Design a protein with these regions (language model features):
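Short, low-complexity disordered leader/linker segments with a strong preference
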Residues: 1-32
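Short, polar/charged alpha-helical segment
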Residues: 39-67, 96-99, 148-156, 198
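Short, well-ordered beta-strand elements
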Residues: 28-41, 61-67, 134-138, 166-168
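Ligand-binding "clamshell"
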Residues: 28-32, 96-108, 155, 197-211
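A bilobed periplasmic-binding-protein/Venus flytrap-type ligand-binding module shared by bacterial periplasmic
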Residues: 50, 116-127, 215-217
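Flexible hinge/capping segments at coil-to-helix
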Residues: 27, 121-137
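Pocket-lining segment of extracytoplasmic ligand-binding domains
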Residues: 92, 172-217
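Short helix-initiation/N-cap motifs at beta->coil->alpha
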Residues: 65-76, 89, 161-182, 190-193
């Protein structure tokens, strides 16, 4: 049986709408689903709301949530059987499929329509994309949706990655905030709550939303 991997749990979240209101399921009868998410962020709020309001329990499901800390880590957990479902970008499924694997993960639903990262700098200034010319951005894992979306947005603003601006892909997803506050790079792209935590500490400022710049992907 093919392992099920997804960037979302929207398909499951729609079940209450399709099946009507649940009558409640005894805890002993719930089926545990091990869900590995790429990061714990308000970006995925619909999933947390569904869990908190008991929508999954109404359908006989108990969600066991784990923070994978990156799409590559999520995929490893799904492929190895440590998790049943992954919440991350679809790129990892494509990479596994392109390797010719018969038992490859599949995408079955969608929770978000754009990238959730924010571009952050060290100074609270009026931002212009030309400010990035000749600078270095910590952009995350090469080939990941956040990094690819960043490169797309840079090109849309006339900046060629690795020529006009360096996109550093050497830092793991869950280490990007620490690398930036530690002095690495001039800019960084971060999801919430890491972005707000950096702002609160006075070590960086949100300049723009990458998702707002790229649009739906």
């Amino acid at each position: 049986m093919k392992k099920i991997f997804a960037p979302v749990l929207a398909a499951l979240m729609l079940l209450p709408l399709l099946c009507g209101c649940g009558t409640g399921t005894a805890e002993a009868e719930l089926t545990t689903v091990r869900l590995n998410e790429v990061t714990h962020s308000v970006f995925y709020a619909p999933q947390y709301v569904a869990m908190e309001l008991g929508f999954f329990a109404d359908e006989g499901l108990a969600i066991e949530l784990t923070n994978g800390g990156g799409a590559d880590k999520v995929m490893t957990a799904v492929v190895s059987g440590q998790s049943d479902i992954g919440l991350a970008g679809p790129e990892s499924c494509i990479y596994i499929y392109n390797q010719g694997k018969d038992d490859h993960p599949v995408v079955f639903g969608q929770l978000t329509a754009c990238d959730g990262a924010f571009l952050m700098g060290r100074e609270d200034v009026s931002f212009n994309w030309e400010d990035l010319r000749g600078k270095t951005i910590i952009g995350g894992r090469k080939g990941g949706v956040p990094e690819m979306t960043l490169e797309y947005v840079l090109r849309q603003h006339g900046l060629e990655p690795q020529k006009d601006v360096i996109v550093d892909t050497s830092v793991q997803f869950n280490m990007m905030a620490g690398a930036f506050t530690g002095g690495q790079g001039d800019y960084v792209t971060l999801f919430e709550p890491a972005a707000t935590q950096v702002v609160t500490s006075g070590e960086g400022y949100i300049l723009c939303s990458i998702g707002a710049e790229s649009g739906a992907i």
